[in-house]
Structure formats: structure tokens, C-alpha cells
């Protein structure tokens, strides 16, 4: 049966207390030591060819050197671990330096190698120590995915909108209950101003063209205007757009000559319509 738990140390021997601890700590993976492998004198990486990538569930590394945590070693531990596998590293630390420095350095190396959730744990008794040194242990986990792996994102299923019925497809006609008392009399909406007869159009608004005479029963005032024009001997053009060769026709009778066609009319402005007085047709007494 292939090993799933690996104990690695850079010393010549490994204490039996450490082996016992590993069997108890990783009981299911170690299977009472049947799936446990111990590797000593692992000063170099010559042993990396012993294990294929992603083949171990747990790797425990014990070191008697304060400077053991080289980046290439941590990367190798990440390679041989399965996704979701755990790594446990215990080393000696100088009491003068304290654990802060080694903690930051080792945690940085683990994160760069791809491990997650590094945390300080209780150290294992049985590792030889010298005066002025103390034990320090750190544990981390390999992510549950492989480096370079890919997976497809699941798209949420979009439910098709129910098609709306086409116009005229409904066979059920709505019932309309109309109360006759609710109907409004249209005549009640008209005011007295609306009922008044509109004013008759002025002579200028009559539909009769300028070249035709007023109708027989003219009521718009056009016949009266034509009668005034006949009495004065002026054309419609002379009244609507009066012009003067001498420039005195619009000033009044005091300035007009004896043959002026506008003689007898009130003063007016040249180019503007001449207004005829209402007493023009009144007989002189």
C-alpha cells in the first residue's frame, strides 16, 4: 500500500515519540502506521524523486537547523502533497531572536509556495534541542485545486419568458355593464359663449376674389366698399397700396393738386391701406 503520510527530518534519527505523535495526530491517514513513511537525513532534495506529484495527504518536516526553510524545499513539499493536503513544519529557534522573525519568514515561504491558512500550532516533544534554542511549529494547507487547473463556470439557467398572446387571440370577451345614468349629456358641456354665433368675416376675409364683384346678397361689407371705390374713382390696388409720384398725396387736400385721385380723403401713409370714412356715402345736406 502506498504511503499517504510522510515524516521528514534532516537529522540522522527520528524519535519514536514523533512517530507515535504522527500516528495519533493523523490516525485516519496513517492507518496505524501502515501508510506512514519516515525519511531521515533529508539535507538535500535528492529524495524528491521518491514521490510523484500530488501523492501524499500529510507531510511533517522536523528540522534541527534554524535556517532550514529554503524556498525550494517548501515548493517541493507543495508538489508532493495532494490538493487539500496538510504540511506541518517544526524547527529550532534561537531564544535571542525569538519566534517573530522565523514566523514571518516561514509564513512568507509557505504563501509563495501556494499554501493557504498558515497558523502557529503546538510543537511536538521529542525533537532534540540545545541550550538557548526553543521549538517552533507552523501548519498550513494546500489549496483544494491544482496549479494551472481550470473549470467551467456554471451559468444560471434563464427561464424563457412565456410568450404573450397575439392580439385578437383571446376568445373570451370582457363583459361591459354600462349604466345609462352614468352617461353625460354633450349639450351640458357647452357654455353660453360656445353657443353664440361666430362673427361674420370682414371684407378682407371674403372668399370672393379681388377680380370679382361682391355677391348679390353681400353681408360681409364688400358691396359697400366697392360702392365707395366707385364714388372715389379709385381701384382696390390704389386703396390697399397707395403710391404718389409727387409725394404729397398722403399729406391731405392742402398739399394735393387739383387732379389728385385721393382728393377728399383724410391724410394717410404711403404704402399702407387707406381707411375710408363711414360718412363717405352719406348724402350732403
UniProtKB/Swiss-Prot annotation:
Disulfide bonds: none annotated. [4Fe-4S] cluster binds at residues 246, 249, 257, 260. A motif (Cx2C motif 2) lies at residues 257-260. Residues 206-220 are annotated as: Fe-S binding site A. It is found in: Cytoplasm; Mitochondrion intermembrane space. The keyword Flavoprotein does not apply. GO terms for biological process: iron-sulfur cluster assembly. InterPro entries: Anamorsin (IPR007785), Anamorsin_N_metazoan (IPR049011), CIAPIN1 (IPR046408), SAM-dependent_MTases_sf (IPR029063). Residues 150-195 are annotated as: Linker. SUPFAM superfamilies: S-adenosyl-L-methionine-dependent methyltransferases (SSF53335). A motif (Cx2C motif 1) lies at residues 246-249. Keywords: 2Fe-2S, 4Fe-4S, Cytoplasm, Iron, Iron-sulfur, Metal-binding, Mitochondrion. Component of the cytosolic iron-sulfur (Fe-S) protein assembly (CIA) machinery. Required for the maturation of extramitochondrial Fe-S proteins. Part of an electron transfer chain functioning in an early step of cytosolic Fe-S biogenesis, facilitating the de novo assembly of a [4Fe-4S] cluster on the cytosolic Fe-S scaffold complex. Electrons are transferred from NADPH via a FAD- and FMN-containing diflavin oxidoreductase. HAMAP family: Anamorsin (MF_03115). PANTHER family: ANAMORSIN. Monomer. This is Anamorsin homolog 1. It comes from Picea sitchensis (Sitka spruce). The lineage of its organism: Eukaryota, Viridiplantae, Streptophyta, Embryophyta, Tracheophyta.
Amino acid at each position: 500500500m502506498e504511503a499517504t503520510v510522510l515524516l521528514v527530518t534532516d537529522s540522522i534519527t527520528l524519535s519514536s515519540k514523533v512517530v507515535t505523535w504522527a500516528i495519533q495526530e493523523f490516525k485516519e491517514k496513517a492507518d496505524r502506521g501502515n501508510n506512514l513513511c519516515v525519511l531521515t537525513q533529508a539535507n538535500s532534495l535528492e529524495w524528491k524523486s521518491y514521490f510523484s506529484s500530488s501523492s501524499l495527504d500529510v507531510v511533517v518536516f522536523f528540522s534541527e537547523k534554524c535556517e532550514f526553510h529554503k524556498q525550494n524545499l517548501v515548493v517541493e513539499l507543495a508538489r508532493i502533497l495532494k490538493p487539500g493536503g496538510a504540511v506541518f513544519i517544526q524547527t529550532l529557534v534561537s531564544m535571542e531572536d525569538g519566534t517573530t522573525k522565523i514566523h514571518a519568514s516561514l509564513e512568507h515561504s509557505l504563501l509563495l509556495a501556494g499554501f493557504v491558512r498558515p497558523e502557529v500550532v503546538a510543537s511536538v516533544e521529542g525533537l532534540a534541542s540545545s541550550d538557548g534554542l526553543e521549538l517552533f511549529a507552523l501548519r498550513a494547507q494546500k489549496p483544494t485545486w491544482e496549479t494551472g487547473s481550470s473549470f467551467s463556470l456554471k451559468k444560471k439557467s434563464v427561464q424563457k419568458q412565456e410568450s404573450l398572446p397575439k392580439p385578437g387571440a383571446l376568445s373570451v370577451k370582457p363583459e361591459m355593464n354600462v349604466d345609462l345614468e352614468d352617461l353625460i349629456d354633450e349639450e351640458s358641456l357647452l357654455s353660453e359663449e360656445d353657443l353664440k354665433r361666430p362673427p361674420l368675416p370682414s371684407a378682407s376675409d371674403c372668399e370672393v376674389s379681388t377680380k370679382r364683384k361682391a355677391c348679390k346678397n353681400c353681408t360681409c361689407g364688400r358691396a359697400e366698399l366697392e360702392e365707395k371705390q366707385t364714388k372715389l374713382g379709385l381701384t382696390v390696388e390704389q386703396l390697399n397700396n397707395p403710391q404718389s409720384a409727387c409725394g404729397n398725396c398722403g399729406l391731405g387736400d392742402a398739399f394735393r393738386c387739383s387732379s389728385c385721385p385721393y382728393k377728399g380723403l383724410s391724410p394717410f401713409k404711403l404704402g399702407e391701406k387707406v381707411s375710408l370714412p363711414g360718412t363717405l356715402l352719406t348724402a350732403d345736406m
